[in-house]
A protein has these predicted regions:
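N-terminal cap/lid segment of alpha/beta-hydrolase-fold proteins
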Residues: 35-39, 149-195
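Surface-exposed, short loops/turns at beta-strand junctions within beta-sandwich domains
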Residues: 94-100
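Hydrolase active-site cap/lid region
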Residues: 299, 303-350, 408, 416-419
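Gly/Ser-rich "nucleophile elbow"/oxyanion-hole loop immediately N-terminal to the catalytic nucleophile
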Residues: 251-295
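C-terminal catalytic histidine-bearing segment of alpha/beta-hydrolase fold enzymes
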Residues: 387-433
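Short beta-strand/loop motif that positions the catalytic acidic residue
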Residues: 373, 379-381
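Proline/serine/threonine-rich low-complexity linkers at boundaries of modular beta-sandwich domains
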Residues: 19-30
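Cap/lid segment of the alpha/beta-hydrolase catalytic domain
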Residues: 210-270, 327-330, 334
Length: 433
């Protein structure tokens, strides 16, 4: 009897699991588009967001979609709702009289589950210009900084890390002295095991005080690559140890913001230049090709490094941070870390006045480095980025006079599609001499 019961239970389980297998797609699906396929408009043109929504493949009917819209990263000025009929709703989101972006937030509910999304559209984006000034002594300032840091021996320490090796790539932990009082950076050097001469690739990190891991895929594609951390903390520490460090140092973008000569990013920018100096000193370097790539803060440091180091031959920044950082003081979206956005961010300036902070940031803003770029670049971002505003990113791209390939994926936010990432790598390889 017990065996028969077990057999029946097993049969029931197999039958029901076949009947109720996991769905291969969502019951409610929706697609967002705009009446201009590239989401670009001229100033003064009205824009419309089109929502198409289905439940089990059947167009939704008589469901309200609620929406708000306004200028990018500004208080959303208009809100309303519209009925989805025959699976579609057309949402008017207004226009702009000045170049920039507008944002629409929308949401709707089906069977108690809420669905929400964001869409941004651009207006005369090729005409967006930075608002932060470029100091007259900008280049002189950085020439002095680099002259001083290069007078300090790098005293490089290289430690083989075979536990990270792949069949074709060897990995080493590198420590580079890049400032006074032993100020250092750490990074992971990944080199093809096959003997030969190779292009070098520098990959600065995104924002935060966090653990980094070796990156092997660039070396597997024929680069000698170095990915670094910028704070001088040994990356072999645990995630828990880095969480504690982040609690202490996480607000570093504001450290010493009152003075450009002591601002935290001075050593960071100089450290990136020294990292490229180190890569160019390697005997396996082909002597010709020096590439830089990164995203967010890494995108910013990519542009800074390419502007400051004469041996860089191409760059591929994604959604650069630290760009047009005083935008909010001019009534438009600024770049990460969103200085001056509101009273809270202004109160977090480590005691610096707005005037002092703006003066300091003018020496560190990426748009001013972008004006100095002389080599080809691959620039990519998505309109829906809520970390690094599209307005600030376009102010950077429009400041570059050197040859540039611009790849925009409007639906992406503060991330990129794998295919775009691969496109950037292949593009860099095309620049090899």
């Amino acid at each position: 009897m017990r065996i028969l019961t077990l057999f029946i239970c097993t049969l029931f389980t197999l039958t029901t699991s076949a009947q109720f297998s996991k769905p291969r797609r969502e019951y409610v699906e929706y697609l967002i588009s705009t009446d201009h396929i590239d989401r670009n408009y001229q100033t003064g043109q009205p824009a419309y967001v089109k929502l198409q929504a289905f439940a089990g493949g059947v167009p939704l009917e008589n469901v309200y979609v609620h929406y708000t819209h306004g200028d990018e990263m500004m208080p959303l000025s208009t809100g309303d709702s519209i009925l989805i009929q025959s699976g579609e709703a057309l949402i008017p989101i207004g226009t702009r009289q000045e170049p920039g972006f507008r944002t629409c937030h929308l949401r709707f509910t089906v069977d108690g589950k809420e669905y929400k999304d964001i869409v941004k559209v651009g207006y005369s984006t090729e005409s967006i210009r930075p608002v932060i000034p470029m100091p007259q002594d900008f280049e002189k300032f950085w020439s002095k900084v680099l002259k001083k840091v290069r007078s300090i021996p790098m005293d490089v320490e290289v430690t083989p890390m075979p536990q990270y090796d792949s069949p074709s790539v060897k990995v080493s932990l590198v420590k580079i002295v890049c400032g006074e009082n032993g100020r250092s950076i750490y990074g992971y050097l990944a080199q093809p095991k096959k003997e030969g001469k190779y292009p070098v690739l520098f990959t600065p990190p995104g924002a935060g005080v966090k653990k980094i891991d070796p990156i092997l895929n660039y070396a597997e594609m024929g680069f000698i690559s170095l990915n670094i951390e910028i704070h001088g903390f040994l990356p072999e520490q645990s995630v828990e140890e880095f969480k504690k460090l982040n609690e202490q140092y996480g607000s570093y973008p504001r450290f010493n913001i009152h003075d450009p000569h002591t601002y935290y990013y001075k050593d960071v920018y100089a450290g990136c230049v020294r990292a490229v100096d180190y890569l160019c000193s390697l005997p396996q370097f082909d002597g010709k090709n020096v590439c830089v790539t990164g995203g967010s803060q890494g995108g910013a440091l990519t542009i800074v490094t390419a502007a400051l180091h004469p041996r860089v031959t191409c760059l591929a920044p994604f959604y650069p941070a630290l760009s047009d950082m005083n935008g909010f003081l001019h009534g438009r979206a600024g770049g990460w870390p969103k200085f001056f956005r509101d009273e809270k961010t202004i109160s977090e300036m480590e005691g610096a006045s707005i005037e002092e902070a703006v003066h300091t940031l003018s020496y560190y803003d990426v748009v001013n480095f972008a004006k100095l770029i002389k080599v080809p670049g691959f620039y990519s971002f998505g309109y829906n980025d809520e970390t690094c505003s599209a307005t600030s990113i376009m102010s950077v791209i429009n400041s570059v006079s050197a040859p540039k390939k611009i790849v925009i994926t409007p639906t992406s936010g503060h991330w990129r599609f794998p295919i775009t990432n691969m496109e950037s790598i292949l593009w860099m390889k095309e620049q090899w001499k």
